[in-house]
């Protein structure tokens, strides 16, 4: 385990593990955190995992971690790493099993007082319309050419099918579609796992949450985005479901077998990788892109389902639900950055990290029952963090421990007492996502804000939560 004494303070919100810490490090490792947060971060293996990332071939700049960092598979969750597209690697562990897990924010034109009398009914309608839980199938079954069209067409394909509007695509990262996607490289097993999962939430930390704008930090930016105090919002958090998980599984196995051919040795096999320019690297990138497109299509269909429930309960009085933005936080993308005196094409791995380009909305959901934030990316992110920010509160307690220490029924009562309507399939699943199982999202966001990576625009309080 890496101790606090192993880190050098760069400034109040940024710490560095120098290359001299371990002989195999190719670049330093850096973590955004307050002094207080660092005490908690050093209690697990996440910084050791970050140091391992710093040993990978072709890594550029620094191995980075956001303040919501915690242990993951290979890479820590909250990790960001950039690799030279010409001679660097791509690693599925740096994207994660839930390819393009991400968040979208919908906004209404009504204050929360307008829906308060209908909140229980709205929660029940959302739970009915948005299938949730492990193994729960959705309203569409995608096979053959239909599945391939979604894998290569992403959210635009769902809009073509009538499940959304053109404006949704304008407000989605990459317009909801990555071009290198190749459906032919997604295994039949992965496609079979995903065939009835479009428009489904899944379980774990995925959710649909109705909230309201509780605080505004930047009035001009909020007005530009169409936000106002007490406005009703809806957050949707989910990803590529079983299909994305299977894509990751298939290619991790293949890369473990392929690495000896490229002379790659690793401190942890969970970092399995191949050169980005290799056949294996290119095939994974194209299959991962297909998985990302499936996730965007999934969130697009869930948006349609949420709008259906909204209209059923509120009718014309509810008005429209417009998409403010959709961001991915488990993905690899090709982006260009200045490295020394030259501009380079880099493979940016974001695992539990959100793109934060200047002027772009950055969505940071909190833990269940706590506030969530809307930030806006800044120029400093482009210079310091490869255009990346945090993605959430970050776990501080394992799911197993949370289930042992927290009673789902008691938690539901506590949330109800806070005025939050809860619709959940299994109470044990509720316990896994209790607020005390996560870090303080206020502190996470403050670090990012103070570091200048992204600035606070608004925060939301939950009034209804739907979980699997």
Where are the predicted features?
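Short, conserved catalytic or adaptor-binding loops enriched in Gly and charged residues
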Residues: 55-56
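Redox-cofactor-proximal catalytic regions of oxidoreductases
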Residues: 80-106
């Amino acid at each position: 385990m890496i101790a606090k004494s192993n880190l050098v303070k760069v400034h109040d919100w940024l710490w560095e593990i120098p290359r001299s810490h371990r002989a195999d490090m190719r670049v330093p490792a850096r973590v955004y955190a307050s002094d207080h947060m660092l005490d908690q971060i050093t209690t697990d293996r996440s910084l050791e995992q970050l140091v391992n990332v710093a040993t990978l071939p072709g890594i550029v700049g620094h191995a980075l971690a956001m303040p919501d960092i915690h242990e993951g598979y290979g890479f820590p969750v909250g990790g960001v790493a950039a690799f030279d597209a010409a001679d660097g690697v791509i690693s599925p562990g740096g994207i994660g099993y839930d390819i393009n897990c991400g968040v979208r924010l919908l906004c209404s034109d009504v204050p929360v007082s307008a829906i308060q009398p209908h909140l229980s009914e709205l929660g029940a309608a959302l739970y009915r319309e948005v299938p949730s839980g492990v193994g729960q199938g959705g309203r569409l079954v995608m096979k053959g050419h239909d599945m391939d069209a979604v894998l290569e067409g992403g959210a635009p394909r769902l809009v073509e099918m009538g499940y959304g509007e053109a404006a949704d695509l304008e407000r989605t990262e990459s317009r909801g579609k990555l071009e290198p996607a190749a459906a032919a490289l997604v295994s039949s097993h992965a496609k079979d796992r995903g065939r009835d999962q479009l428009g489904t939430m899944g379980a774990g930390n995925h959710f649909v949450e109705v909230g309201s704008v509780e605080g505004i930090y930047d009035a001009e930016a909020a007005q530009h985005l169409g936000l106002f105090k007490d406005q009703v919002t809806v957050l949707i958090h989910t990803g590529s479901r079983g299909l994305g998980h299977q894509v990751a599984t298939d290619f991790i196995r293949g890369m473990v077998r392929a690495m000896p051919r490229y002379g790659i040795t690793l401190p942890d096999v969970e970092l399995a990788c191949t050169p980005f320019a290799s056949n294996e690297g290119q095939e994974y990138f194209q299959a991962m892109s297909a998985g990302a497109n499936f996730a965007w299509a999934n969130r697009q269909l869930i948006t349609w389902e949420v709008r259906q429930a909204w209209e059923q309960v509120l009718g014309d009085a509810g008005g429209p639900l417009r998409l403010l933005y959709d961001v991915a936080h488990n993905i690899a993308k090709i982006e260009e950055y200045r490295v020394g005196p030259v501009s380079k094409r880099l493979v940016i791995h974001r695992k539990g990290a959100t793109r934060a380009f200047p002027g772009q909305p950055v969505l940071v959901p909190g833990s269940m029952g706590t506030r969530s934030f809307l930030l806006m990316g800044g120029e400093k992110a482009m210079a310091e963090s490869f255009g990346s920010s945090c993605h959430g509160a970050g776990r501080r307690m394992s799911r197993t421990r949370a289930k042992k220490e927290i009673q789902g029924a008691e938690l539901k009562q506590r949330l109800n007492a806070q005025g939050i309507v809860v619709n959940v399939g299994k109470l044990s699943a509720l316990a896994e996502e209790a607020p005390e199982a996560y870090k303080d999202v206020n502190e996470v966001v403050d670090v990012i804000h103070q570091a200048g990576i992204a600035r606070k625009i608004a925060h939301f309080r939950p009034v209804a939560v739907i979980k699997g």
